[in-house]
Each structure stands twice: as structure tokens, then as C-alpha cells.
Amino acid sequence: MKLRPLYDKIVVERLEEKEEKTPSGIIIPDTAKEKPQLGKVVAVGPGKLLDNGELKPLSVKEGDVVLFNKYAGNEVEIEGKIYLVMSEDEVLAVVEDYSSLIGGEVRWQQRQLSTTRKQGQN
């Protein structure tokens, strides 16, 4: 791949999830699934440009497996493969032991918490 990200940008290749089946054995097609939010960093920029003109090195490095928000980055196609170009700020976490997840799964779900009060409670 010939892509060199600038400043605090990183290039991420999504990690594919295993095939999903419903309890009744129906295979869920890729078009019906959400895109994975786990990826491998394949390129990093030189660092974040600070107000004083200095570059602050990035925390992530090539080869890191990262977790990111489903709306993070911009998709680009390079040599027939789809990559995400995003700011380091869009990375939620670095997965320290990805080998323990192989064959398993990572699920990321955002939940909205609602607070309701019953009548008579403060």
C-alpha cells in the first residue's frame, strides 16, 4: 500500500468478523450486518501538530489493533481493499491482547440510559 497519512491521521484496515448465524441456523448476510469497529493500524502520520508548531508523536503505531466508533473515519479504496482514514482522536481504545479474541467476538453497543421516576419518588 502506498499511502502516507499526514499529521495525526492513521490508516486502519477493518478486521473481518466471523460468519454469523441465528439460533435457528440462518446465516446473516454481510449486507445485513453492521461493519466491524475493530481494525488493524496499517499506517500512521508523523504526529499531531501542536499550536507551537511541534509534532507530538501518536500513541498508536502500525500493527496495533484498535476499537473505534462506527462513524469514525472516511473509507478509501486502495488496490482493491477498503481502508479507513481517521484521526487518532477517533480511536476509542487499543486492544492489548488481540490473540485472545481470535475465534471470539467483540461487541460494541452504545446504549442510551433513561432515567424515569415513579410517582411519589424524589
Swiss-Prot record:
InterPro entries: Chaperonin_GroES, Chaperonin_GroES_sf, GroES-like_sf. Keywords: Chaperone, Cytoplasm. The keyword Zinc does not apply. It holds the Pfam family Cpn10. One of its GO terms (cellular component) is cytoplasm. It comes from the Bacteria. GO terms for biological process: chaperone cofactor-dependent protein refolding. It is found in: Cytoplasm. GO terms for molecular function: ATP binding; metal ion binding; protein folding chaperone; protein-folding chaperone binding; unfolded protein binding. Together with the chaperonin GroEL, plays an essential role in assisting protein folding. The GroEL-GroES system forms a nano-cage that allows encapsulation of the non-native substrate proteins and provides a physical environment optimized to promote and accelerate protein folding. GroES binds to the apical surface of the GroEL ring, thereby capping the opening of the GroEL channel. Heptamer of 7 subunits arranged in a ring. Interacts with the chaperonin GroEL. Belongs to the GroES chaperonin family. This is Co-chaperonin GroES. The lineage of its organism: Bacteria, Pseudomonadati, Aquificota, Aquificia, Aquificales.
